[in-house]
Amino acid sequence: MPAPETLTPLVVRFGAFGDMLLLIPMLKALARRYGRPCELVSSGRWTAPLMQRVPACGPVRLLTSRRAPYWFNRSQWELVDWLRQHPPGPVYVFEPDEKSHWLLHRGGIKQEWICSLRGFPRQTGESIMHHALRLARETPAALNGSAGYAVDPSFHPDARPTLTEADQRDCHEWLSAKGLADSPLVLLQPGNKKTMKGGNRTRSSNVDYWPESHWAMLITGLRERMPAARLIICGSPAERPLAEDIVASLPSARERVVIATDDLPILRLLALQTLAHSMISVNTGPAHGAATMGCPLVVLFTRHQHRSADLYAPQPTTAPVEILFPASIDPEADLSSIAPETVLAAWQKLSVAG
């Protein structure tokens, strides 16, 4: 059996931005337990820069697609080749699908080294983050009875990445260039992947859509309550048309609103969230980022999604979080029934809580 100092934990997780933020405590727990940064198998072009700010995470290997047939996907071949050269060590698979296990087994990873979600369901009321931490406390069969890999029950890792001075400086320079450096900042996140996934964003299947007119009314209310504030519409470049439609719906004071959908790579967004007064968002990764970075958050949530506040407020955190649901108890109800006045009231409550 390898000596304790030679073991490097390997984690497999193919998650969206928010999912990967909520994985950070697991990475920290495993790195502390085994004494080395984790290796990570994942996906997403933003995963590598995010994990560069997590000292508990070492090398990251990315798949372009895990669902594609193996013989048609070079990144899967390369992963399997790498696994075949990989020394034995603990492997934690925070994925429910069979493809992850198939790739591991094809790469020669023996089952005795693997801890996974197979037979390890979430407990009632358990958040994704705490589910991952519980998996991190499991011990691979290959290490049963071994000394040196005990779980530290006093260690309670948070989900916060460690931003550098360069990250903060980049954000401050961007704010100065936009004329935003001296104003309170309220961040708005109207879009997510589901909203922007082709077709008409008002389609009935898009339950995460909150109408442009609602956003415009919200912005008007925010301006009335905090006249000095500058409002920044966040998102990806694909979400710019939605942001432009929202601004076009404003009756006045459009100069106080900045569309930043082309200007916010992951690390700048996280740095911005450490500086902002607050954020209002639909259910999407940047909302996780706000709670993680200590930015007070109002998030609009459909009822079929996870209800645990811990999902949006990774512990420990200094961020007050208000989660708003549709008025209807129908699990398929969309967000449109949440009135702008309700969101404004929740936002004002944040200011009191903060």
Annotate each predicted stretch with a short phrase:
Residues 1-354:
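Catalytic machinery of carbohydrate-active enzymes
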